[in-house]
Amino acid sequence: MTRPRPVVLIIMDGWGVAPPGPGNAADLADTPHVDEWMATCPFTTLGASGLDVGLPEGQIGNSEVGHLNIGAGFIVYQELTRISKAIADGDFFTNPAFLQAIEHVKQHNSALHLMGLFGPGGVHAHEDHLHALLELAHRQQVRRVYLHLFLDGRDVLPRSALGFLDTLEGVIARLGVGVIATVSGRYYAMDRDKRWERTGRAYAALVDGIGERATSARAAIEAAYANDISDEFVLPTVIVDAHGTPVATVRDGDAVIFTNFRPDRGRQLTRAFVDPDLNERIRQHYERQKAEGQPLPPQIWQRDRQLHDLCFVTMTQYEEGLPVLVAFPPRYVTTPLAAVISQAGMRQFHIAETEKYPHVTFFLNGGREEPFPGEDRRLIPSPKVATYDLKPEMSAPEVTEALLQAITSDQYDFIVVNYANPDMVGHTGSIPAVIKACEAVDAGLARVVPAILERGGVALVIADHGNAEQMIDPETGGPHTAHTTNPAPCFLIGGPGYGKDTIRLRSGGRLADVAPTLLELLELTPPADMTGQSLIVRNL
């Protein structure tokens, strides 16, 4: 059987699969062509949310993550999920950066410090990761382990730290390792706006033992609440013993593990520890601020001294060039689908209207801006309306025309198109408009698919996440405007040799399986890092 050409990936953005009902606009729409293909062609559904796309369990999918997974051909884990998965798998406890920090403190007979945002917020850090580090220290028999808790109050309730402290104290008691040495509101310890005077107060508590004083973390938090200060704004506080001496400070020869996985609010404090040119950098910053006529702080903070022989580990890469160990370095999508096609000398065409153009280019290509050799692109402007329920067809007719030109040019081996309508109109919450949006997509495919089949090509039709199939909120009965956790449809339309009598699409797939499926149709071998599996099962 000759290789199909072109192989076309059609992404019906936001068209999920759900039972019929008054809120399922995709089902309510008059879409005879899509309905027929779903019924008569090889069909399956794909996991497009939660763990299937590298998000936390139960989290709705989105277009950025969806297209990243589609193009990568493997599950692209977001940092929270990646670290939590490493804990579950056990890989966390053999992480080279963590083990190097532990070896450092053993060789220097020094202390291990764990610092980061405290609690289950999951935006910048997660308490499970801190608990796992305590477990690691216990397994490795590290005796001196000190905790520096940055209180949240933003990604969680403003005064919730005491509850998280109960949990942490239970872990410490169970493992017999860990002593809380400082607490500080994230306002100080996690500033990202070059307000160095805030960072300086946190650093002074951590390194010099200078700040508010309390006999325990609980006492520090309760004292703040008594002064009507919520978690975020708790002044950097040093925990002291019965003699008024700090329980611990970070010293020369120690090791620090910064538990934040989101980079932006970890950079500044990390620089305070490891940047040899910090004071000059701060001075230049305030000189620029002064030249721009901006107000300066009453006192410009300068680091008294930089710690020596410090082993500093960040959970993820906060910034290129920092002299730190990175526990979970960025995992780049080195050979996305478009790269494999390009390396084979094939031509490809990526098209969408403005709203979804970055998704079929930047995100599908693994975060790469530039096209690969042999990759052509076409951007169709989205209509300029206040909200897309006013024009539910959006630019689908124009996308279809340009797509037909690409197909009939016979230049391309692979084509990808995104129809934005079900998602973008779905966000308006208007069921009549979303019905029209789905009908506009059906009308476009009614013209496109025959042109593909006439040339001996095939079309793989999918969605990247759900939306249009759930327009009524099950809790409130009001409009539902968000994405869903419903699966995405996936069906293959082709000529002889591609019907249900010849092949089927396996169940249990996810978006990461799309690229290997397309490469099988293109008769190309997936690269080693493309761990997704083709959905095609050939009937014997």
UniProtKB/Swiss-Prot annotation:
Pfam families with a match to the protein in the record: iPGM_N (PF06415), Metalloenzyme (PF01676)
Top-level division of the source organism's lineage: Bacteria
**Which residues participate in Mn(2+) 1 binding?**
423, 427, 483
Q: What binding details are noted for the cofactor?
A: Binds 2 manganese ions per subunit.
| Annotated EC | 5.4.2.12
Annotated active site residues, numbered on this chain, are: 63
Example of a GO MF term:
manganese ion binding
SUPFAM superfamilies linked:
2,3-Bisphosphoglycerate-independent phosphoglycerate mutase, substrate-binding domain, Alkaline phosphatase-like
Q: Name one GO cellular component term.
A: cytosol
Q: Which reaction does it catalyse?
A: (2R)-2-phosphoglycerate = (2R)-3-phosphoglycerate
List GO BP terms, alphabetically.
glucose catabolic process; glycolytic process
Residues that hold substrate according to the record: 124, 154-155, 186, 192, 262-265, 356
* Pathway info: Carbohydrate degradation; glycolysis; pyruvate from D-glyceraldehyde 3-phosphate: step 3/5
Keywords (alphabetical) are: Glycolysis, Isomerase, Manganese, Metal-binding
Annotated positions binding Mn(2+) 2: 13, 63, 464-465
Q: Which family does it belong to?
A: Belongs to the BPG-independent phosphoglycerate mutase family.
Q: What does this protein do?
A: Catalyzes the interconversion of 2-phosphoglycerate and 3-phosphoglycerate.
Q: How does it assemble?
A: Monomer.
* Record-linked HAMAP family: GpmI
Q: What is this protein called?
A: 2,3-bisphosphoglycerate-independent phosphoglycerate mutase
What organism does the UniProt record list as the source? Chloroflexus aggregans (strain MD-66 / DSM 9485)
